[in-house]
């Protein structure tokens, strides 16, 4: 099934890297972007608003380096953080002009992922090409925890939606790891899963069955892992319960639906975004069918990096692409 384009907007001169809906306002969307495809030059944070007929830019904030990711605050409806190519993290208040409210510089390489804790709303996590994951709180000028998570680039770090102290990470080393942030030393993972034979670029926790984690890889697959199948004593290779095939090139992002336990979306370098049904993880279905592709959005003309489900309107997705376009669409 092809997608239905609902609204679109352009971000001229900037490649879209990440997008996120506000957890407070149904009609507000933020985009992290970079000039020159993120290779050199500045970045821009775009705040977009949508109504029944249009998607328009409300405000923009410029940064000195590319912006690769963002996360809305869970405690302040007008604030969000961005991660940059120079290793900096900035906290912005969209009711103010130009300058960030707070800035941190501890990472020594690109910050590629930011995730605000949905349960402990005072903190957020960052992951970087410097192999580290850091946890922050806006009230402090330095990080409150540093985890040497992998021996190579950490593409994503995301908090569990059911445990404030549990974090998952994925890396160019092909592994998916989980961490208990209460445990010392923080260099020891709770679980280590051999997720893919290639780099793992993205992960997401299922919001309804939180023992399931989806990963997306350079190997063109999305894999779904059941953490209950993993043991704490060794590298696990038997946690994968489903592999989703269909993308033609590397998959940049994966996200479970916030409204349907058995649906997830993915996007990547084949210029498409896809929605999948994974009915076997929905316990109410007595005779689940195999996982299946249920829709494709193929209207972008460049790599699709940003992907977000609407938190208020079931089935509505946003994508941000290197074609300098933001699309809102549904199946």
Task: State the predicted function of each range.
Residues 1-181, 187, 191-208, 215-217, ...:
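WD40 beta-propeller repeat fold
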Residues 229-231:
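Hydrophobic pocket-lining "lid/loop/helix" segments that shape and contact the acyl-thioester
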């Amino acid at each position: 099934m092809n997608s239905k384009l609902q609204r679109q907007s352009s971000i001229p001169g900037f490649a879209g890297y990440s997008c996120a809906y506000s957890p407070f306002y149904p009609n507000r969307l933020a985009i992290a972007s970079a000039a020159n495809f993120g290779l050199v030059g500045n970045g821009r944070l775009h705040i977009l608003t949508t109504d029944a007929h249009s998607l328009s830019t409300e405000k923009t904030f410029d940064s000195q380096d590319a912006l690769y990711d963002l996360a809305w605050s869970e405690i302040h409806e007008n604030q969000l953080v961005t991660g940059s190519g120079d290793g900096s993290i900035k906290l912005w208040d969209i009711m103010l002009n130009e300058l960030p409210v707070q800035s941190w510089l501890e990472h020594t390489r690109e910050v590629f992922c930011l995730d605000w804790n949905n349960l402990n709303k005072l903190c957020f996590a960052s992951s970087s090409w410097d192999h580290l994951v850091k946890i922050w709180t806006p009230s402090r000028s330095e990080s409150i925890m540093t985890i040497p998570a992998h021996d190579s680039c950490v593409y994503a770090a995301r908090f569990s939606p059911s445990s404030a102290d549990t974090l998952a990470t994925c890396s160019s080393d092909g592994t998916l790891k989980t961490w208990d942030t209460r445990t010392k030393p923080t260099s020891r993972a709770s679980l280590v899963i051999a997720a893919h034979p290639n780099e793992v670029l993205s992960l997401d926790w299922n919001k309804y069955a939180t023992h399931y984690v989806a990963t997306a890889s350079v190997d063109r697959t999305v894999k779904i892992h059941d953490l209950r199948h993993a043991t704490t004593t060794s590298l696990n290779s038997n946690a994968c319960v489903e592999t989703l095939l269909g993308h033609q090139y590397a998959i940049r992002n994966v996200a479970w639906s916030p409204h349907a336990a058995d649906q997830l979306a993915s996007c990547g370098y084949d210029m498409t975004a896809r929605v999948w049904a994974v009915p076997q993880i929905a316990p109410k279905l007595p005779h689940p069918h195999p996982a299946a592709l249920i829709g494709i959005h193929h209207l972008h003309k460049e790599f699709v990096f940003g992907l977000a489900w609407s938190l208020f309107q079931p089935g509505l997705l946003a994508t941000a692409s290197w074609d300098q376009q933001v699309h809102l669409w549904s199946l």
